[in-house]
């Protein structure tokens, strides 16, 4: 009887180990799939600069460039968006500076349209949409 109990114990232990290793394989074998699955702990990507754009060029792409905030104590803070404020916008984009309703100044790179009547209308539409997104 003692032999069969140890066989059952060994069998159950192996079964638990196989199940645990099958679940752990998803966590350990594919660390970059972490954002696709909820509750998954992914390893950080090493060796990538957060200041560069996706294309790897030295210019800012479409979107937020920087924010200038004056805190309650009068402390000034410059927050960088996708790139630093010293880098120019990429070709085909121009930089605009505006102010939110709460007093925060921001700069962003928006498409630079040719100065024709139809493009002026579409340029103002794009600018108003981007401003409405910033106010949310």
Curated annotation (Swiss-Prot):
Signal peptide: 1-24
Location in the cell: Secreted
Any GO CC annotation of this UniProt entry: extracellular region
Keyword set, alphabetical order: Amidation, Disulfide bond, Neuropeptide, Secreted, Signal
Propeptide residues according to the Swiss-Prot or TrEMBL record: 49-135
UniProt PTM: Contains three disulfide bonds.
Gene Ontology biological process terms from the UniProt entry: neuropeptide signaling pathway
Disulphide bridges, residue numbers: none
Family from the record: Belongs to the SCP family.
Protein name, per record: Small cardioactive peptides
Origin species: Aplysia californica (California sea hare)
């Amino acid at each position: 009887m003692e032999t069969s109990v140890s066989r059952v114990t060994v069998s159950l232990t192996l079964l638990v180990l196989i199940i645990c290793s099958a679940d752990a394989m998803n966590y350990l074998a594919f660390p970059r799939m972490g954002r696709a699955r909820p509750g998954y702990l992914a390893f950080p990507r090493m060796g990538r600069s957060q200041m560069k754009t996706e294309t790897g060029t030295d210019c800012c792409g479409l979107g937020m460039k920087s924010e200038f905030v004056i805190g309650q104590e009068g402390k000034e803070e410059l927050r960088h968006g996708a790139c630093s404020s010293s880098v120019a916008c990429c070709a085909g984009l121009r930089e605009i500076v505006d102010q939110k309703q709460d007093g925060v100044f921001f700069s962003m790179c928006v498409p630079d349209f040719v100065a024709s009547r139809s493009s002026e209308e579409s340029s103002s539409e794009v600018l108003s949409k981007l401003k409405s997104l910033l106010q949310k």
